[in-house]
Amino acid sequence: MMQLKEKYKKEIIPKMKEKFGYKNDLAAPKLEKAVVNVGFGKHVKEKEYVKHIQEILEKITGQKPILTKAKKSISPFKLRQGMIIGAKVTLRGNRMYDFVEKLINITFPRVRDFRGINEKSVDKTGNLSVGFKEHLAFPEIAVDDVENSYGLEICIATTAKSREEGLELFKLLKFPLKNS
């Protein structure tokens, strides 16, 4: 599954150098990390639900998730400081490239009513944020075994210096972006 990394080195870097006038290969923006995040929401106190989500995240990413804790108390939400409120996985290197390739080629086409990622999902520093309403689009999840579906967020960080560089990188990587 290392085709994306090889494609980046052989095809994308020369195109980025030509378009933006970089003198060095290392000046071209590249993918830095991919973060997959799930918030537990109203199920915070249900230990079985938390454990189930951790297992699903591990299946999807191939890496054990870490639990995220609340930074401060918010009484209307019945949230206390230090309470576990979600789980996240940070992927770097080869695992990140494998995950992003799977995301582009397998997961996005499996999403119901998917019409592309809005270009506004790329921020001013060239990072992409995508939210999924249900986790069933991932190939590791057997639809028959699922009791309830939940959403997750994926943030892909790049070394791009501007939004234009980030957008061009994602277009060259064949992300299904649509014009806003």
Residue ranges, per PLM feature:
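Ribosome-associated RNA-binding proteins
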Residues: 1-180
